[in-house]
């Protein structure tokens, strides 16, 4: 199985759907779904996902390289792994999504969207995770969902962590720092993301990794993400990652800007970078007689997008943690 990405993009089912790799067994579970199980017993399970948005190709290329290293035997596997290419049809078309944003649909929220390829795929991925986690006895469960951002950022690489009732484990946060993430953003409320689903339903330590900016296949400079690729390789093979890194800055979400109607106006232009700072009192958005302003001394914007569909998030506002 050295052509997982090509088969997924072409919509082709391989003639052989299971086999042996270098120290592990593999199973093709469907388009964009590949399970890897080490020959030796392990108590760690990992979801490695990318391509939830079809125009975010750099992480897909990174995963393809990791798979090549595993199948060539140059990289040892010490986790049970489910590799997920989230939205194959959008990846093939080179578009973010066909009908609706899948990363708003998880946790059963797909039922409130008009039926589409994305709603069907979200349901399929939920079932795939349920099967994967229920078929093993993993003591450790991680989910790393790799993305790229629509716009530029003051932090080239950053992580977004779902709301969680328990404290985050130190070794997980340390690995995120070793993977080159410059900032970590902590959600304070539930959401429809893939990582919130895996965290809430299966107790996984989950993070959305935002790596650079969305570009078409073949146009990505993957050298920007060498530190992340090296950390992923070390993780898969059970090697300790470097401890000589600057701890990521930490932010928490303090509010969400939502577009409710065509009267919505977001006062940020296309050049506004993620993590741009705004002073207290700054007018951020208006909709009819409703005004959204900065309420803390300083707030930072994340994922500003004035053109989202009505009812969806047009941006998050953050505050920096000590």
UniProtKB/Swiss-Prot annotation:
Descriptive protein name: Succinylglutamate desuccinylase
GO biological process terms on file: arginine catabolic process to glutamate; arginine catabolic process to succinate
One Gene Ontology MF term: succinylglutamate desuccinylase activity
Tagged with keyword Zinc: yes
Designated gene of the protein: astE
Catalytic activity: N-succinyl-L-glutamate + H2O = L-glutamate + succinate
Pathway assignment: Amino-acid degradation; L-arginine degradation via AST pathway; L-glutamate and succinate from L-arginine: step 5/5
Pfam families referenced in this protein's UniProt entry, alphabetically: AstE_AspA_cat, AstE_AspA_hybrid
Lineage: Bacteria, Pseudomonadati, Pseudomonadota, Gammaproteobacteria, Enterobacterales
Function comment: Transforms N(2)-succinylglutamate into succinate and glutamate.
Active site: 210
EC numbers on record: 3.5.1.96
Cofactors, names only: Zn(2+)
Annotated binding of Zn(2+), by residue: 53, 56, 147
Family classification: Belongs to the AspA/AstE family. Succinylglutamate desuccinylase subfamily.
Key words, A-Z: Arginine metabolism, Hydrolase, Metal-binding, Zinc
InterPro entries for the chain: AspA/AstE_fam, AstE_AspA_cat, Aste_AspA_hybrid_dom, SuccinylGlu_desuccinylase
Cofactor note: Binds 1 zinc ion per subunit.
């Amino acid at each position: 199985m050295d052509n997982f990405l090509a088969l997924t993009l072409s919509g082709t089912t391989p003639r052989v759907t299971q086999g042996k790799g270098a120290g592990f067994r593999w199973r093709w579970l469907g388009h964009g779904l590949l399970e890897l199980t080490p020959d030796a017993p392990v108590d760690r399970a990992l979801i490695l996902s990318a391509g939830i948005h079809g125009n975010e190709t750099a992480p897909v290329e990174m995963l393809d390289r990791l798979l090549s290293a595993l199948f060539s035997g140059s990289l040892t596997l010490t986790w049970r792994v489910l590799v997920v290419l989230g939205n194959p049809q959008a990846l093939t078309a080179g578009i973010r999504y066909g009908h609706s944003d899948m990363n708003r649909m998880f946790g059963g929220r797909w039922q409130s969207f008009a039926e589409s390829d994305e709603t069907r795929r979200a349901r399929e991925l939920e079932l795939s995770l349920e099967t994967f986690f229920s078929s093993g006895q993993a003591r450790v469960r991680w989910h790393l969902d790799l993305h790229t951002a629509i716009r530029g950022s003051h932090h080239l690489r950053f992580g977004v962590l779902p709301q969680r009732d328990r404290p985050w484990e130190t070794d997980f946060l340390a690995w995120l720092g070793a993977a080159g993430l410059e900032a970590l953003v902590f959600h304070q409320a539930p959401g429809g993301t893939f990582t919130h689903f895996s965290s809430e339903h299966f107790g996984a330590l989950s993070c959305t990794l935002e790596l650079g900016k969305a570009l078409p296949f073949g146009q990505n400079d993957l050298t920007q993400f060498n530190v992340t690729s090296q950390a992923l390789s070390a993780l898969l093979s059970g090697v300790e990652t470097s401890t000589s890194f600057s701890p990521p800055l930490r932010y928490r979400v303090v509010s969400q800007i939502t577009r409710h109607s065509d009267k919505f106006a977001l006062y940020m232009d296309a050049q506004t970078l993620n993590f741009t700072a705004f002073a207290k009192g700054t007018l951020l958005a208006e909709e009819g007689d409703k005004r959204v302003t900065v309420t803390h001394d300083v707030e930072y914007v994340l994922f500003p997008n004035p053109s989202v569909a009505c009812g969806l998030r047009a941006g998050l506002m953050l505050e920096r943690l000590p």
